[in-house]
Each structure stands twice: as C-alpha cells, then as structure tokens.
Amino acid sequence: MWVSPSRIIRLRRAGAWRDFRDHRIITRVAEHSNPSPPSPPLCDVLASLRAATAEQHARLDQAMPLSGSTPTLDDYRDHLLILRAWLAPLERWLARFGDGPQDAARLPSVPRASLLEQDLAHPAMPSGGMAVDEIDVATLRGDAAYRWGVCYVIEGSQLGGAVLYRQLSRQLAPHPLDYLGAGKTPGPRWQQFLQALRANVQEPADIALACAGAQRTFNDLLARVPACASSGTR
C-alpha cells in the first residue's frame, strides 16, 4: 500500500506509525518468505501491476473518508458505502467464473460484501450517509488475466484494512469494525494470491491485460470518492 509523506506524518502524530511500519514489514515478508520458482519471469506481473496503478493508489490513499487524522464513525459509514457500491457488484460479477482467480483450487473464495452490510447495519453506526451508485460491470472483460488484475486490487485492499483496524478499533468502539477486522492477518492470504498470480500471469499480453483490469478497478473506485470524482479520474 503506497503511502504519501503527509500520511506518514499523520500516522506518526496519531501514534500509529509503528502499526503501519509493522504492516509494511508483514506485507513484504508475506510476498517473499516462501520459496519461489528458481527463475521468475523476466517481466514480473507484480512489478508491472504496482507501476501501472501507483498514481491511482496514491490518489485513493489521500481521498478515502478514513484518510483524515481523526476519523469518526460517520467517516467509516461513508467509507463502507463507497466500498459497497464498488465491491458488491464486482463480487457478483466474479462469481460467474470458475477459472483463473475464481478457481477455488488456486484461491478459495472469500466473499466480503456481506461484512460491509453487517457493519452498516450495526446499532452503533450513524444513520444517513452519501448516496453512491454501483459500478457498471457490463463493460468489464472476462479474460482470466484481466480478472487477475481486478482481484489484485480487491485482495490488496485487505492489507490496508488491517492497518486501519489496528488504528481505529479502540477509537471507533463500540463498533466492532468487522469488515476491517476480517483482514487482521492478511499475510497468508496475500502470499497465496501472489504465488497464484505469478504462476498464472507470465506472458506479456496477459500481464498487459492484468494491468488493464487493475487500472479499471481502481478507476471505478476513485469515481465514487467525492474528492476524486470532482476532479475526474484517469
């Protein structure tokens, strides 16, 4: 998860820098701790995905409702409303497939939209919030490589969720933050995903498709964040 210098300053002021630093260490260890194939592809899909989405990731990191220095439950509600409009239709669309990242033998399915609904319905959650239109999945490509890129963004979002849970679980109590808490230990799942991604997306054409899927997925999310939507997405 890319983090700007200003975000680092805010984390330090909030006393959460150690949590974030630990998260970065866990993430890197998760990516590299298990043995890898002796000769990785010359064109690495993970490096390509990171480069293709770095700008979008940076913009999103600054603009989501929970990115402020003192988030409230109102901010968490709006955060979930944005994610629901993005994630729920994506999960329904991905459920139509049984190959690529949707092959349960490669990566077991982990539905997350139901946790969003559960958190939104919790008695501690303030009522109201913004109206957010669901993304349009009709023009998404069905290629397996493209879906690997889509899932790269979805799976990666759980890493940030783990950091947010550690930062906010006390601050936003008594709300349990079940959606964020579901990713408290994302390392093993993320490692499993990366191994499957690298094993199945190696050809340059497939890597390009994965990057296109990831960029589209980021753009669909950015378009639902008021601070980004007002300035347009690229």
Task: Tell me the role of every PLM-derived stretch.
Residues 1-2, 29:
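Compositionally biased, low-complexity segments
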Residues 2-13:
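Low-acidity, Ser/Thr- and Arg-rich intrinsically disordered low-complexity segments
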